[in-house]
Curated annotation (Swiss-Prot):
Matches recorded under Pfam families: GIDA, GIDA_C_1st, SAM_GIDA_C
Protein name: tRNA uridine 5-carboxymethylaminomethyl modification enzyme MnmG
Compartment annotation: Cytoplasm
Encoding gene (name): mnmG
GO terms under cellular component: cytosol
Keywords: Cytoplasm, FAD, Flavoprotein, NAD, tRNA processing
Cofactor: FAD
Quaternary structure note: Homodimer. Heterotetramer of two MnmE and two MnmG subunits.
Residue numbers binding FAD: 13-18, 125, 180, 370
Amino acid sequence: MHFHERFDVIVIGGGHAGTEAALAAARMGSKTLLLTHNIDTLGQMSCNPAIGGIGKGHLVKEIDALGGAMAIATDYAGIQFRTLNSSKGPAVRATRAQADRALYRAKIQEILQNQPNLRLFQQAVDDLIVENGKVTGVVTQMGLAFEAPAVVLTAGTFLSGKIHIGMQNYSGGRAGDPPSIALADRLRELPIRIGRLKTGTPPRIDANTINFDLMTEQKGDTPLPVMSFIGDVSHHPRQVSCFVTHTNERTHDIIRGGLDRSPMYSGIIEGVGPRYCPSIEDKINRFADKSSHQIFIEPEGLNTNEIYPNGISTSLPFDVQLNLVRSIKGMENAEIIRPGYAIEYDYFDPRDLKNSLETKSIQGLFFAGQINGTTGYEEAGAQGLLAGMNASLQVQGKESWCPRRDEAYLGVLVDDLSTLGTKEPYRMFTSRAEYRLLLREDNADLRLTEKGHQIGLVDEDRWAKFNKKRESIELELQRLRSQWVHPNSPLLEVLNPELNTPISREASFEDLLRRPEMDYPKLMSLEGFGPALEDQRAAEQVQIQVKYSGYIQRQQDEIDKAIKHETTGLPLELDYQEVPGLSNEVIAKLNDHKPETIGQASRISGMTPAAISILLVHLKRRGLLRKNPSKS
């Protein structure tokens, strides 16, 4: 049985990858179908109620710069906003928001339902139609066939998903949802390498049974950050606090006592879990010398009493979960609403993908999200947007596009996955990007929005707002460069008291702003130096571009020179333990492989470009930077 219409692009799955993929293809004019097993759960936040953070916030800003929905929905759903690393440099500053699950889901669904060229249909997909190495459509569980020359698969944790709580396990895509067994079996027939991964979630706690007075309150920032470049503080709902508490030795003893019934430690779970978001039982085992671990008590919404205790993800039996929760300060009388669990699922080796996220073996079939071995809403959303965009470009007969590593964290993400693959759930960090000073949150629109408009991802309203901001930045930079203060200028009467060293020679306003004791608001507040830009985000951009211009240019030069280090030699006797900044994982790989050149090192599976940059700096400092004649 065939559906009565043909489509250009079909997207399977309605999570963060699927929604961004469907919206991207539809924005570009492709007739798009989004298939999901349950329309009511479109945009569901399956795990933690938060968007953004270190590295992840950068991806959200890039999705937004390319016209995506995640940042907009977060502004309408965020009940606490914070800028992380605010005291550090702009490269590692990141926006994070606690989100009301219901508000976030509702906003995503509103955006989907009002998107031209997009059709929603509720049916699980059981089969792919592949003819002569090309995908031509899909078949749903009731035997209904939909035809399209491009299919984006965003199955999340649903492919042969298995949920574990203690020694009990059952099939499921997530709590309350069925797995995709038939589709998983079909995908196993494809010439793509497959593996199993694991992730988990903590028990949800009844807020009415928590004593918040015994915890440390954590308020949001003032003034409130905004996630979207076209967002506004007025979009934010009522703001609330989070709280912080800690595990203790009694907690750890309870966990150790339950490990014999842990599916992780009894060999029942075979999938590899996320290194940087371990379960509480994994933390206790890996960091046995630590007497406590921090737990963030996060509200799940304004109209629910459910609390997400970030930091105690677990698959221990329910009785152990309850005891460990009640051993924590402030939760002595806590009641669990939903037990924590682990889930195992199929993923496919992303090295079998092109950087467009199209599979190398089947034309027109694209993968995005956790199916590619990543973890996190933000990583999924970014991949979804890229896959949906490239599916649409292919249907239109145009070349695919993926940003380079020096253009976007999205480029870093895709390059890492498609080049190196992953054996564990991959999450984004700023440390994965070797050019992170160029890839800041604040300039994501300046890096990507013009390209997004050319491709068709960015609408005219966003494009107009972007051009207004970009023009104001350029004009202000020109003004600062063209206006000067001379040693005999009357402006010095108000300026010199603000400077560590008085002006003794002529200086441009730009030179003054470069001084460490001066910032843009202070300079503009002085009589004769204003007026300041009204747009605070444009003003921030002016300050960063001026103050970091030398570093930015240096990093741009590094990009231009990067390809020249292919044959740079690495001494075989080099002690990688002595190289500051290398992770233990990277040190182990280098000691195991003993590469002769930087080029060889860069191709070791799991070797990060950031680690290569660290090696180059170390070689230069030790006077060891030389070409390997045997490799020239």
